[in-house]
């Protein structure tokens, strides 16, 4: 059933109808459309369009339809309706007859779809926040269990300084906490109702839009009808949050893919999140992580696509805005799936402490400690940096770690070096000295875990 046929003397070409119709994707707004229609029916009572009895009849029919949709959502796609609004209205008329045709009084699909989409966004943000916090909790638990797992930290993918696996986990907790904050901020800005703004100029009925917003669970009503029906900032904000969040998950995946290689060997992934090869029987591939990394690109694409769609649109509503949904639905679905999968990866991960320790002892990760030692002895840092560089070259030549060079060898580079240097060069000393806030010392890591646990509840 088309909602606009009176103006036209010819039927739409079937090819145009297929091109124009949006039911194949906006069916996902069915529940929100019905909830919005119930609230609108209440508003129509306040301005005398509906009687209380008529409203009750409409609300009952809409609630029955809501339960029917929840029980069998696939029925929507069996229809040839143009969009979800047409489908809901058609089903309502089937149930209550002519009364159903009164519901759209004073309402446009422009404010209707804007309301539906915001309601869907609110519901989905709630799911994303839950999944985000679950992954944070999984990371914190993994950190708590691996505070003593010393491993090399990297810059330029070269061993740099020793850290712990716990400290690595907590780095991603910080990223996810920022993602959580971005979602909460976006939620505040989208929590305003456009319903009652009509096509673009507002409704001719003196509806209390603040009351209507409250019935729908919004914090308030929007202030400008032109902006309200054409605003898709909330779509851009959520796509941006998803794009950033997926970058974080992609980096998380890349780190673990590397840690899981035979060359690194720091972790073993569970069989539950890996697959094999059809040819090579020895293979155990990190498919879950590779897919997280790969899916990052489609989310970035959705954000870029939506920005390009909106950038040249004049006020107010344009059919281009129908393109807001598919990318948004896919991007947020993808982000949600990847958050769940990342938590599943952590659920069965095994940290190989001996191999982590061995790798941390290689690569001269304690070179900075020797430089700091020289500074403490009064050597200017730039000179100390040069001295340690020369000592590392000699250690490499001899195939030894710095701490295995005899004192006589070390003193060739600086006479201030004494026997007290050797405790300084131990991995534990390297960790203990990083005791400033945010550092890798055991005390700081324990405090960071406690802080995260308290924040996450």
From Swiss-Prot:
GO biological process: arginine biosynthetic process via ornithine; L-arginine biosynthetic process
InterPro entries listed in its UniProt record: Arg_succ_lyase_C, Argininosuccinate_lyase, Fumarase/histidase_N, Fumarate_lyase_CS, Fumarate_lyase_fam, Fumarate_lyase_N, L-Aspartase-like
Listed EC numbers: 4.3.2.1
Matching CDD domains: Argininosuccinate_lyase
NCBIfam families: argH (TIGR00838), PRK12308.1 (NF008964)
Presence of keyword Lyase: yes
Family under the similarity heading: Belongs to the lyase 1 family. Argininosuccinate lyase subfamily.
PROSITE patterns assigned: FUMARATE_LYASES
Name of the molecule in the record: Argininosuccinate lyase
Molecular function GO labels: argininosuccinate lyase activity
Enzymatic class: lyase
Gene giving rise to this polypeptide: argH
Main localization, broad class: cytoplasm
Keyword Amino-acid biosynthesis: yes
Top-level taxon of origin: Bacteria
Subcellular location: Cytoplasm
GO CC, any one term: cytosol
Pathway of action: Amino-acid biosynthesis; L-arginine biosynthesis; L-arginine from L-ornithine and carbamoyl phosphate: step 3/3
Keyword annotations: Amino-acid biosynthesis, Arginine biosynthesis, Cytoplasm, Lyase
Reactions catalysed according to its record: 2-(N(omega)-L-arginino)succinate = fumarate + L-arginine
Disulfide bridge map: none
């Amino acid at each position: 059933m088309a909602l606009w046929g009176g103006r036209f003397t010819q039927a739409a070409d079937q090819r145009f109808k297929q091109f124009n119709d949006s039911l194949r994707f906006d069916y996902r707004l069915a529940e929100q459309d019905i909830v919005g229609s119930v609230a609108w029916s209440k508003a129509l009572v306040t301005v005398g369009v509906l009687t209380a009895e008529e409203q009750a009849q409409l609300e009952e029919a809409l609630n029955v339809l809501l339960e029917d949709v929840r029980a069998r959502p696939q029925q929507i796609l069996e229809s040839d309706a143009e969009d979800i609004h047409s489908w809901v209205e058609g089903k309502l008329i089937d149930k209550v007859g002519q009364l159903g045709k009164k519901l759209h009084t004073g309402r446009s699909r422009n404010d209707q779809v804007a309301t539906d989409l915001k309601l869907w966004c609110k519901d989905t943000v709630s799911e994303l926040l839950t999944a985000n916090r679950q992954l944070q909790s999984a990371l914190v638990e993994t950190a708590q269990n691996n505070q003593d797992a010393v491993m090399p930290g990297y810059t330029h993918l070269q061993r740099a300084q020793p850290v712990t696996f716990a400290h690595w986990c907590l780095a991603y907790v910080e990223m996810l906490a920022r993602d959580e904050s971005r979602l909460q901020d976006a939620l505040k800005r989208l929590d305003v109702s456009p319903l009652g703004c009509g096509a673009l100029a507002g409704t001719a009925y003196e509806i209390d839009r603040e009351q209507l917003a409250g019935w729908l669970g919004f914090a308030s009503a929007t202030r400008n009808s032109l902006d309200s029906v054409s605003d898709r900032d909330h779509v851009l904000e959520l796509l941006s949050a998803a794009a950033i969040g997926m970058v974080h998950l992609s980096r998380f995946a890349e780190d673990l893919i590397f840690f899981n290689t035979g060359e690194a060997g720091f972790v073993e992934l569970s069989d539950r999140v890996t697959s094999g090869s059809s040819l090579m029987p020895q293979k155990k591939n990190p498919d879950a992580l590779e897919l997280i990394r790969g899916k990052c690109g489609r989310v970035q694409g959705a954000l870029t696509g939506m920005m390009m769609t909106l950038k040249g649109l004049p006020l107010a509503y344009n059919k281009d805005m129908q393109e807001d949904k598919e990318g948004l639905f896919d991007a947020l679905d993808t982000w949600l799936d990847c958050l769940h999968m990342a938590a599943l990866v952590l659920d069965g991960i095994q940290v190989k402490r001996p191999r982590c320790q061995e790798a941390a002892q290689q690569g001269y990760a304690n070179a900075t400690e020797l430089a700091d030692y020289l500074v403490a002895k009064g050597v200017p840092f730039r000179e100390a940096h040069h001295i340690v560089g020369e000592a590392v070259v000699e250690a490499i030549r001899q195939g030894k770690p710095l701490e295995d060079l005899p004192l006589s060898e070390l003193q060739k580079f600086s006479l201030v070096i004494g026997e007290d240097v050797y405790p300084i060069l131990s991995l534990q000393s390297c960790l203990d000295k990083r005791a400033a806030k945010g550092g890798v010392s055991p005390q700081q890591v324990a405090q960071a875990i406690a802080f995260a646990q308290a924040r996450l509840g």
